[in-house]
Amino acid sequence: MGQKVNPHGLRVGVIKGWDAKWYANKKNFADNLIEDNKIRKFVKKELFSAGISKIEIERAAKRVKLNIYTAKPGVIIGKGGSGIEALKNKLTQFVENKNVLINIVEVKSAEADAQLMAENIAAQLEKRISFRRAMKQTMQRAMKHGIKGVKTACSGRLGGAEIARTEHYHEGTIPLQTLRADIDYGFAEADTTYGKIGVKVWVYNGEVLPTKKVEKEEANA
């Protein structure tokens, strides 16, 4: 099961939270969901050069708050916050009659972030760099940041081959079945002359102990 399912979805409610933090009734749920999807696609496309790792969306009655996790916060913020204001104005086409708030969160170690690693490998594949070299170099850089393990997979017509295949590489340990294991997951697609190549990255950051268990142990000590 752990090998097949998205590691984020499997751990939601256990050690991971939701990327969309809002509640809506049946009447508004679909509209909000479509709105969220449009916002995510637009922000990823508009700020691709900033290295967007994750976008969290929080909603209140007349307010939409975006938490944008990025490797290059300066690119988004701009001179004197001009970049954020420009982004807010552009987002009004998706969010009607609501106040948009944008919070920028810096990703400290971009080379060990699964989503940014996947996008980096995809970008190298589009530049016709060997998929083996791209995967191995990205993994080696990530391991230097103190992570416990990393696994990468590339699927498609690798190297322009007639038959599509999947190739995996991994270093360290990746306990996908263990729910308390903090697994970061990223996916990206490379558009090559032979077609699309899918890139998946799993990063193991160590175990997360449930807070109740930790509190109980502290009380007994």
Swiss-Prot record:
Domain (KH type-2): residue spans on this chain: 39-108
GO process annotations (BP): translation
Record-linked SMART domains: KH (SM00322)
GO cellular component: a single term: cytosolic small ribosomal subunit
Keyword Protease: no
Keywords associated with the record: Ribonucleoprotein, Ribosomal protein, RNA-binding, rRNA-binding
Pfam families: KH_2 (PF07650), Ribosomal_S3_C (PF00189)
Stored InterPro entries: KH_dom (IPR004087), KH_dom-like_a/b (IPR015946), KH_dom_type_2 (IPR004044), KH_sf_prok-type (IPR009019), Ribosomal_S3_C_sf (IPR036419), Ribosomal_uS3_bac-typ (IPR005704), Ribosomal_uS3_C (IPR001351), Ribosomal_uS3_CS (IPR018280)
GO MF term list: mRNA binding; rRNA binding; structural constituent of ribosome
Main function: Binds the lower part of the 30S subunit head. Binds mRNA in the 70S ribosome, positioning it for translation.
Oligomer status and interactors: Part of the 30S ribosomal subunit. Forms a tight complex with proteins S10 and S14.
Sequence similarity: Belongs to the universal ribosomal protein uS3 family.
Name this polypeptide is given: Small ribosomal subunit protein uS3
Natural source organism: Clostridium beijerinckii (strain ATCC 51743 / NCIMB 8052)
Organism classification: Bacteria, Bacillati, Bacillota, Clostridia, Eubacteriales
